[in-house]
Amino acid sequence: MWWTSLVFSVLLFDLIFISNCDYIHLPGNSDIPDLKLQSGYLNANENGTQKMFYFLLEARDIPVGEASLIIWFNGGPGCSSLSAFFEEFGPLYVNFGGKSLFENVHSWYHKANILFLESPIGVGFSYDTEQSNFTKVNDDSIAEQNFNSVIDFFQRKHSSYVNHDFFIAAESYGGVYGPMLSALVVDSISKREFPNENFKGLIIGNGFMNVKLSTNTMILWSAYHDRTSPDEWDEIKEKCATSGAHDVDYYDFMQFMKTTNKMDYLADNSTECGRLIEPLLGQFSETFDGYDFFNYYHDCYTNFSIPNATDPIKETLAQIPRRRISALFNKHSTDGQASYRCWADDALHKYLNLKEVQNALGIDRAWKDRKKKWEVCNMPIYDQYVMTHQDMTPFFSKIFDKFTGPAFRVLIYSGDIDTACNYLADGYFVRDLASIHGFKKTLKHGPWYHSEHKVIAGNFMRYEGANHLGSKLSIDVVTVKGSGHFVPLDRPGPALQMVHNFLTGKPGKMTNYTSPV
């Protein structure tokens, strides 16, 4: 019958469509069975010997063809962006045992398509086909790897995204990755060489964009958070004064510090000032006192991430009587998320090293044959790293000067209790950047609110200007109250609202971060 042929044809078309999409099913995912997730490898160099692993997550609440694309990088340097998927703003988190997943209702995929890149080569499942232990990279080589991978994404792997609006987004040391990659993309677009010209903006979360500002403001932040006494602070102001500084806010404390990699600075105990400021430097102090570097007010009574732990999750589970799930809750922790931050890395490490998970993700046989384990961060990369560009101002300047589109928008957001990349440094950095380019502050510092209940979520301000080509330029500086380094994890609801309102903001118009999602 004709109708049976029609039904067969429709079913065949559906099967072909599904097979062409190549959506993967994550083992242990029973909460979101219709998740549209793809994974694979992009070529990070011209000859294709460097393979960068990626996740591509399709938007849920907005049609894929209409939703913007966020291209995401974690920092480190040397840390995997899959931790952002499973621990920050992805749709699924890993349960304590490391074998199953549960839904994150505040995932950013509700409002955007998201590409997660494991950068640089050597991180996570990314690898070099010719070198089994590829760990030697720097700021410039990473920028080239990222640039080549993004081109390969648009040209070869997912050409259907070539007309999508897209934003580059990054966190922490991604405050270096993001501006450097953006400068390359803008330059390529200006030469009409880049496959997608719809580059709309840059998002930086708790960014490490200027070493001097980040290091010096850490002293200020610590001093005003009870890490010294009034008398000791007065002594610091006396002994650490530097030439030309009329106020402690402008002291160059780095003159009394030392470094081996140009990004991590320790107090120089051979100087009087160095001895005084050492307790204020937190994790980079030789007398580190054990507070959470990424969230000043967060505590874990058990450190699930100690380097010598063989299998801390297995050991903990063995101590929990059957069906007493409440025992998993950390009664001594200061968070309300079942202490997820305390054990998430270990759960994720266990999950992504399961054979069935790696098979589902399509991990290359060449990577598996090296008998390595997936790690949240590749510490040999970090240990060998020497920072090349300590100030991102020149790269922002390249972006602003060469941008040819109608408008380019920047969002700089920061958790206000992060001591790894503190909010003061980002605020000072943007203020100075705006001054260099003649931007005007069009919105003074003031609060924004989360949800229809108008709960204060932080503060924000805006700078606006234009370049010589007539492109409108804007920078929004947003703080998230009560959040540490990982804003989408610490304050998931406000983070989703903030990003959604930024993505849907209109050039030349004020973004309403208070608008509920």
Curated annotation (Swiss-Prot):
It holds the Pfam family Peptidase_S10. The active site is at S172, D418, H485. GO terms for biological process: proteolysis. Residues 1-21 form the signal peptide. One of its GO terms (molecular function) is serine-type carboxypeptidase activity. It comes from the Eukaryota. Its EC number is 3.4.16.-. Keywords: Carboxypeptidase, Glycoprotein, Hydrolase, Protease, Signal. This is Serine carboxypeptidase ctsa-3.2. It comes from Caenorhabditis elegans.
